[in-house]
């Protein structure tokens, strides 16, 4: 890939305030990342769209709004552009329409603030639509985020040859943490309460609530239709595309949302994975490859006591060794965590 000509980002933080699913660090995660993008990676403020569910947010992170923002990024990208999506919020696993789709027999999804789910098949479709020479990096700090780009090649994950020895480590020092997980049954129950219809198929409720703005991959959950391969997915081999996923955990694991105990205003809530990425970037101001960044973040989480959360990397072989966000040269970080 040639050096990026334009850098465009969509940052999404969902705290689900005043609900039983409330998290605390997700908005902080993406605001810190926005500062990093500008100070270190050459992004311009006007090319970064931030969607949060804060009370004063001008654009809420609904499924439709997230989809539109990502769709604009992909549609307007030119060869050499660098696209970035950072999501911090809840994730879920959906029973697969195709039971042998992959090992966990479920599809990964993120949970926007209105529960209009966006699935791994949706992200695959976005990557397939990329123009040649455009990179699309995703950081998903959510539960079950491993494999969030469907069929992306695993570089660091459950079956990776990259092993970090799990030596004895202290448990998480700040015990006030919560998994970024909403179980599928809870998602279905919530959507059922909103739609008012009786159905065990999630697609029925999503269609009733969101119509054509729902995920196309969930419309035919009752009578599943295999996704077509006749579209833009034929432009390049699946293992040669420019989708890059840095996930907060494996597909069968949870990611942690940390809320420092007490009323210490100097310690903000954060997502464990987002914080580990930001700490690694702050401590190593030189160029880091995608592989190096994930390995260092995985090691840091282990040192912090997160022995059951393993960040993963999914991308082509070439992109595994490519610089994170195609950084060139050494740039000092001006922002703080």
Where are each of the predicted segments found?
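Intrinsically disordered, low-complexity segments that are common in secreted/host-exposed effector
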Residues: 44, 49, 59, 157, ...
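Caspase-like cysteine protease fold
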Residues: 9, 188-266, 280-337
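Caspase-like (clan CD) cysteine peptidase catalytic core
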Residues: 61-88, 92-157, 165-185, 189, ...
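Short, small-residue alpha-helix embedded
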Residues: 271-282
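Generic recognition of well-structured, leucine-rich alpha-helical segments
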Residues: 18, 40-44, 73-77, 113, ...
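Catalytic cores of nucleophile-dependent amide-cleaving enzymes
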Residues: 16, 27-28, 107-157, 209, ...
């Amino acid at each position: 890939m040639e050096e990026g000509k334009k850098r465009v980002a969509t940052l999404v933080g969902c705290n689900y305030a005043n609900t039983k699913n409330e998290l605390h660090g997700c908005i902080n995660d993406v605001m810190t990342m926005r500062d990093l993008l500008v100070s270190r990676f050459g992004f311009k403020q006007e090319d970064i769209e931030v969607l949060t569910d804060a009370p004063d947010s001008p654009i809420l992170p609904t499924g439709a709004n997230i989809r539109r923002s990502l769709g604009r990024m992909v549609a307007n990208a030119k060869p050499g552009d660098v696209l970035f999506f950072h999501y911090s919020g809840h994730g879920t696993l959906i029973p697969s329409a195709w039971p042998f789709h992959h090992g966990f027999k479920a599809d990964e999804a993120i949970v926007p603030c209105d529960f209009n789910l966006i699935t791994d098949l949706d992200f695959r479709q976005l990557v397939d639509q990329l123009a040649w020479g455009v990179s699309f990096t995703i950081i998903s700090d959510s539960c079950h985020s491993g494999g969030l780009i469907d069929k992306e090649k695993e570089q660091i994950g459950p079956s990776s040859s990259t092993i970090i020895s799990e030596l004895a480590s202290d448990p998480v020092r700040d015990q006030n943490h919560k998994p970024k997980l909403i179980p599928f049954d809870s998602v279905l129950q919530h959507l059922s309460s909103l739609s008012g219809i009786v159905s065990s198929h999630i697609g029925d409720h999503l269609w009733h609530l969101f119509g054509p703005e729902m995920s196309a991959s969930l419309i035919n959950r009752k009578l599943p239709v295999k996704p077509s391969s006749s579209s833009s997915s034929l432009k390049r081999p699946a293992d040669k595309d420019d989708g890059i996923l840095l996930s907060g955990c494996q597909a069968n694991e949870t990611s942690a949302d940390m809320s420092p105990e007490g009323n210490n205003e100097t310690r903000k809530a954060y997502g464990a994975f987002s914080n580990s990425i930001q700490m690694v970037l702050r401590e190593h101001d030189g160029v880091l490859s995608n592989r190096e960044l994930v390995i260092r973040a995985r090691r840091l989480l282990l040192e912090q006591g997160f022995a059951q959360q393993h960040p993963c990397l999914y991308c082509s072989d070439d992109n595994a060794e490519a610089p994170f966000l195609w950084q060139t040269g050494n740039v000092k970080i001006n922002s703080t965590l």
